[in-house]
Amino acid sequence: MMSVVKGRLLGLGVGPGDPELITLKALRLLRAAPVVGYFVAKGKKGNAFGIIEAHLDQAQVRLPLVYPVTTEKLEPPLCYETIISDFYDTAAEQLAAHLDAGRDVAVICEGDPFFYGSYMYLHDRLATRYESEVVPGVCSMLGGAAVLGAPLVYRNQSLSVLSGVLPEEELRRRLADADAAVVMKLGRNFDKVRRVLVELGLERRALYVERATMANQRIVPLERVEPMASPYFSLIVVPGDKWQGGAGGE
């Protein structure tokens, strides 16, 4: 009896939201994949799936990976880390069933798979068992800088990418030391982040955008953002000071 050649695991970055920002390579592999997996909240279609839906044909298997309805703050004996780890274990085995049957599986990921992408957790579980390939995508901070018209770093400057979930003192220290910064994962952390920016005198350089490159993108002055209304898909760009050697003259 001949053994079945296992399928390939593909992690495809599909860009920050604008469907035209998917790469040619990701699109080619997506169209050729028998199975397409995508992360989604219960009852939702999902942003990543919305980006690529028009490129799929009826023969391709759609495999939604539905996040558990939970929160990071749970009462004992429940634990967010355990629940989400179990979810990724189960999702990985769903993919493995197709891979073992010889079917390639493309897992789509908004932005870039290895930049805060949920695909990473499947890659950690499966890449040692199956042939895999990761296709990079345009990540949200680059989409954000583009729509804001804000060059991130000049010449020898360094860029710090920070998570809004950092403790306030740690966030303050890192922003104070940064030539330029992008703060991700705002949501309910927005008020803390804005407070730190004001304390450091960075609020005038700081630029805020929600859902960069998506159809419902919003660019709002930092002082006018409602803290409780800041969505997960929002970020703040603090560009580096302009390099005078590149400044144009009159």
From Swiss-Prot:
The keyword Cell cycle does not apply. InterPro entries: 4pyrrol_Mease, 4pyrrol_Methylase_sf, 4pyrrole_Mease_sub1, 4pyrrole_Mease_sub2, CobI/CbiL, CobI/CbiL/CobIJ_dom. The keyword Methyltransferase applies. Pathway: Cofactor biosynthesis; adenosylcobalamin biosynthesis; cob(II)yrinate a,c-diamide from precorrin-2 (aerobic route): step 1/10. GO terms for molecular function: precorrin-2 C20-methyltransferase activity. Keywords: Cobalamin biosynthesis, Methyltransferase, S-adenosyl-L-methionine, Transferase. PANTHER family: COBALT-PRECORRIN-2 C(20)-METHYLTRANSFERASE. It is an enzyme of class 2 (transferase). It catalyses: precorrin-2 + S-adenosyl-L-methionine = precorrin-3A + S-adenosyl-L-homocysteine + H(+). GO terms for biological process: cobalamin biosynthetic process; methylation. CDD domains: Precorrin_2_C20_MT. Homodimer. Its EC number is 2.1.1.130. This is Precorrin-2 C(20)-methyltransferase. It comes from Pseudomonas aeruginosa (strain ATCC 15692 / DSM 22644 / CIP 104116 / JCM 14847 / LMG 12228 / 1C / PRS 101 / PAO1). Belongs to the precorrin methyltransferase family. It comes from the Bacteria.
